[in-house]
């Protein structure tokens, strides 16, 4: 086949036409021969330059684009690089770059029961456990943005529950305070009043029991002394000399009153006016006598009242009233 191509006549074209004709066998004999020669020369001169520029461009483009067969020593294949990037963004993959350890608070005696999860590195979990802020904290892996969002939502829900509990506690405290003001305060006041009444009755009952218990027993020293004082007061009240002294004081008071009336009559008979008044000496004597008698009367009155009071107390202690019939 190649020999036949080489022995093809010089005037015949690729499709069997003469060189004098066109590409589809058309005749070119009518064109001048002088015009065809310069055109052929220009095409022959421009063809090498165009071919050389295309070769240079293909070499530059081939050097910049990746070819499947051309691999370097420091560059991984594109599918492997894409898979590596996807693994770093995947929160469920061990090679995820967006991960850290947070801490949850638990009971201290339950800390040994916790351990790393299925997608966690035990070594990293142990390192996080050593860096825990307190003995009752455990590390929890948080990888990717979904884990952070889930933890924030959980914290927000827990805070909302705590706020609801606080509102319930405040409402309960308000109700307790209101009930205390309306009910317990009144009950406490009534109980205090009843306590005072019962204390008074218990004291009175204890005094009566003590008197009944000591009846028939010998008196103590204080009781004997009090008895002697009461007997002396009773004797003083019943002493005839005391009555005679009272009669003497009354008589002296009557005499003094008569003396004052006599002085008044004498002043009126002598024509002394009220504007002149009594003499200073007479007024002083009369005033002194009246003051002395008044002091004596007050002293006697005070002694009588004290004796009467002591006698009533003694009578209450030694003659208690009979208990009321039930």
UniProtKB/Swiss-Prot annotation:
Gene3D superfamilies per UniProt: 1.20.5.3600, Single helix bin
GO cellular component, one term: nuclear membrane
Segments forming a coiled coil: 218-239, 280-321
Keywords attached to this entry: Coiled coil, Membrane, mRNA transport, Nuclear pore complex, Nucleus, Protein transport, Repeat, Translocation, Transport
Superkingdom to which the source organism belongs: Eukaryota
Topology class, membrane: Peripheral membrane protein
GLFG repeats: 22-25
SLFG repeat residue intervals: 13-17
GO biological process, one term: mRNA transport
Residues covered by region (Disordered): 1-52
GO MF terms, alphabetically ordered: structural constituent of nuclear pore
Record field: compositional bias (Polar residues): 1-10
Subcellular location: Nucleus, Nuclear pore complex; Nucleus membrane
Residue spans of biased composition, Low complexity class: 25-52
InterPro entries listed in its UniProt record: Nup54/Nup57/Nup44, Nup54_alpha-helical_dom
Protein name (database record): Nucleoporin NUP57
Organism the protein comes from: Chaetomium thermophilum (strain DSM 1495 / CBS 144.50 / IMI 039719)
Gene: NUP57
């Amino acid at each position: 086949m190649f020999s036949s191509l080489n022995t093809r006549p010089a005037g015949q074209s690729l499709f069997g036409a003469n060189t004098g004709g066109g590409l589809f066998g058309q005749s070119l004999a009518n064109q001048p021969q002088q015009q065809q020669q310069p055109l052929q020369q220009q095409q022959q001169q421009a063809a090498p330059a165009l071919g050389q520029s295309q070769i240079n461009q293909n070499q530059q483009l081939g050097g910049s684009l990746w070819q499947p067969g051309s691999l370097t020593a420091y560059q991984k294949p594109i599918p492997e690089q894409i898979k590596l990037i996807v693994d770093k963004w995947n929160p469920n993959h061990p090679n995820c770059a967006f991960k850290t350890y947070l801490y949850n608070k638990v009971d201290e005696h339950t800390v040994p029961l916790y351990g790393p999860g299925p997608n966690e590195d035990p070594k990293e979990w142990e390192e996080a456990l050593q860096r825990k802020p307190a003995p009752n904290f455990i590390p929890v892996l948080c990888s990717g943005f979904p884990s952070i969002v889930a933890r924030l939502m959980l914290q927000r829900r827990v805070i909302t529950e705590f706020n609801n509990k606080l509102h319930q506690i405040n409402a309960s405290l308000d109700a307790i305070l209101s009930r205390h003001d309306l009910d317990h305060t009144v009950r406490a006041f009534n109980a205090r009043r009843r306590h005072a009444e019962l204390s008074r009755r218990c004291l009175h009952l204890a005094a009566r029991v003590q008197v009944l218990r000591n009846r028939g027993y010998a008196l103590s020293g204080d009781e004997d002394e009090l008895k002697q004082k009461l007997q002396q007061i009773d004797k003083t009240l019943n002493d005839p000399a005391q009555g005679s002294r009272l009669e003497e004081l009354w008589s002296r008071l009557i005499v003094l009153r008569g003396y004052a009336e006599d002085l008044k009559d004498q002043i009126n008979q002598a024509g002394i006016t009220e504007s002149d008044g009594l003499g200073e000496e007479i007024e002083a004597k009369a005033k002194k006598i009246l003051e002395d008698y008044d002091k004596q009367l007050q002293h006697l009155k005070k002694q009588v009242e004290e004796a009467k009071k002591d006698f009533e107390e003694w009578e209450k202690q030694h003659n208690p009233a009979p208990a009321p019939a039930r």
